[in-house]
Amino acid sequence: MGLGILASRTIRPASRLLQSQTSNFFLRTIVSKPELQSPESAAVSEPEPPTQILPPRNPVGGARVHFSNPEDAIEVFVDGYAVKVPKGFTVLQACEVAGVDIPRFCYHSRLSIAGNCRMCLVEVEKSPKPVASCAMPALPGMKIKTDTPIAKKAREGVMEFLLMNHPLDCPICDQGGECDLQDQSMAFGSDRGRFTEMKRSVVDKNLGPLVKTVMTRCIQCTRCVRFASEVAGVQDLGILGRGSGEEIGTYVEKLMTSELSGNVIDICPVGALTSKPFAFKARNWELKATETIDVSDAVGSNIRVDSRGPEVMRIIPRLNEDINEEWISDKTRFCYDGLKRQRLSDPMIRDSDGRFKAVSWRDALAVVGDIIHQVKPDEIVGVAGQLSDAESMMVLKDFVNRMGSDNVWCEGTAAGVDADLRYSYLMNTSISGLENADLFLLIGTQPRVEAAMVNARICKTVRASNAKVGYVGPPAEFNYDCKHLGTGPDTLKEIAEGRHPFCTALKNAKNPAIIVGAGLFNRTDKNAILSSVESIAQANNVVRPDWNGLNFLLQYAAQAAALDLGLIQQSAKALESAKFVYLMGADDVNVDKIPKDAFVVYQGHHGDKAVYRANVILPASAFTEKEGTYENTEGFTQQTVPAVPTVGDARDDWKIVRALSEVSGVKLPYNSIEGVRSRIKSVAPNLVHTDEREPAAFGPSLKPECKEAMSTTPFQTVVENFYMTNSITRASKIMAQCSAVLLKKPFV
């Protein structure tokens, strides 16, 4: 019997009894209240439901929103949280601001949107099906739900398809432990799969000596394809086929010829692209991470050194929006094996038979101290190498000066370089500021091999705003549209006089940027060239109160600090007349100019070029083994952090020179690195302000006019081999392989 019939039978007797007891009169009483007469008042009088208090959330990855115009802000709701984001933000970005981490494989914040992995599906109110949050723009009032059963089921289904052809070989995969596919399959995937057919396999591709490929693991996210074309500026990778036959590779078998190719290892979310030199060496949880900086060029890219015990195992990039973003060059990433080859571990003295023998520090310093007093003060020369830190250069300068000589300089600072005004050797626009330029004039520099991360900024700007690029110098290969204007000073003269066709574009540019290579400092007519460059800058509104587009791209990590500290060659003939030469890591000095009867002390960490001319060898620590201050090409001061212990009996550079000063009878007045930095503060205060950029205060208007004439000699290539530029890279087996395989490629 139904519940409805049972209820009606139960109610009927009671209703009949009620009818029998009532009279025939019907009374109706109406009670009127003010709330009933006004619906608005009634709504106000009703108690409001209690407001749900949501727990606070923090933006994902420290995401921050900046509104250039408050009217461009729109409000969306993410899981009930009201969030204001700028117009043009995607749903995924809005979720990150709201503190929700959306899973993704194909999306990368620095690459274009592909929307092909579908892992970022979320539910949007009034949408018939889940939407890809990476490609969907956020709209005003949009209500986004990220944790509903529909969104969870959609992601679970996507993950099942992604794992359908994946080999699931995590135990032998180098990506294990830092794999996005591992993490997201655990968090968003199912605990079982329904695929029982045979899995496909893909032939591995040969991309060169740096990147290892296991293409069967590839999930076709196309991050590497987009990175190659959008950031590296090369069209080496592409996608072939469709459906289950889809794969990533090169249409014609070739190597990846970019100087940034190693970055595809970091952005690959699976183990399809891994480091070939690091293969099967270590797991990430076995490594100790140390945040430091790179010294292979003058950019000062932020890096993380992963070590195990006394050995550096790998180098990976560290985020710094102002310098290298999250990319590093292949030279920075893979030169680490040079830190354990050809190292100098003990003090040595050349014997009478021409061979070196190991001695104690006391004996080595005693020999040097005796010899230095046997020569005249003006015959003493000190040269700092391109990898020297500010502390060691300051101590070397003080020591040589106390010995009565002014002949102390750093590699790359030739005689006659004007270091009185910092604007004349710094990148005044700043590296990140290059993105605001709409025209580039490159003079005697090839950023692709001299400073790969500066070149990446230029490439990014050209792609984003179609900025024009003009180049004056020897023929070179660029990875963006560039017009070759000429090869030398004659072209500069035409531009300065307004006779060159490029002058029209230069005149019409709103924010023109001129980048001058530091290789011009070694020319005899450098002052005339720089004067011509400054006249071009003044005539074309390159330098003004709101924009300084006059830039100098330095070549070495030690160059900027050396110029700040005054390590400048006084005479071009100083080396040829020297009787005592102190080379502190200076391997690119022309040792043929050193007299045969001169006594040479080599202080450094590698047995490189100059060590064969040395009479005494003093072992020093490398940049991964010491704390030192460096200033990059834009004037940004940073410090290295020791990641591994020193090799053998090596010591820090400044400590060696400080001990030598005491043995030589000219004891320097500091015993700690803090004391050295106090001395630096009195000479160049900007070098003690770590992680800050000190811009140049003055411009070309204060510089006197140069009367010299420019030579007609064309500009020369500064970097002949991108992979072999200092003692560490020259000792690297990986860099030697790259040089052998890629030497015939255009960019080297």
From Swiss-Prot:
GO process terms (BP): ATP synthesis coupled electron transport; photorespiration
Co-factor requirement: [2Fe-2S] cluster; [4Fe-4S] cluster
Domain 4Fe-4S Mo/W bis-MGD-type: 287-343
Domain of life from the UniProt record: Eukaryota
Keyword terms of this UniProt record: 2Fe-2S, 4Fe-4S, Electron transport, Iron, Iron-sulfur, Membrane, Metal-binding, Mitochondrion, Mitochondrion inner membrane, NAD, Oxidoreductase, Respiratory chain, Transit peptide, Translocase, Transport, Ubiquinone
PROSITE patterns noted in UniProt: 2FE2S_FER_2 (PS51085), 4FE4S_HC3 (PS51839), 4FE4S_MOW_BIS_MGD (PS51669), COMPLEX1_75K_1 (PS00641), COMPLEX1_75K_2 (PS00642), COMPLEX1_75K_3 (PS00643)
Residues engaged in binding [4Fe-4S] cluster 1: H166, C170, C173, C179
Composition bias type Pro residues, residue spans: 47-58
GO molecular function, one term: 2 iron, 2 sulfur cluster binding
Reactions this protein catalyses: a ubiquinone + NADH + 5 H(+)(in) = a ubiquinol + NAD(+) + 4 H(+)(out)
EC number, UniProt record: 7.1.1.2
NCBIfam families according to UniProt: NuoG
The protein's assembly and partners: Complex I is composed of at least 49 different subunits. This is a component of the iron-sulfur (IP) fragment of the enzyme.
Stated role: Core subunit of the mitochondrial membrane respiratory chain NADH dehydrogenase (Complex I) that is believed to belong to the minimal assembly required for catalysis. Complex I functions in the transfer of electrons from NADH to the respiratory chain. The immediate electron acceptor for the enzyme is believed to be ubiquinone. This is the largest subunit of complex I and it is a component of the iron-sulfur (IP) fragment of the enzyme. It may form part of the active site crevice where NADH is oxidized.
Name of the featured protein: NADH dehydrogenase [ubiquinone] iron-sulfur protein 1, mitochondrial
Taxonomic path: Eukaryota, Viridiplantae, Streptophyta, Embryophyta, Tracheophyta
Gene that encodes it: EMB1467
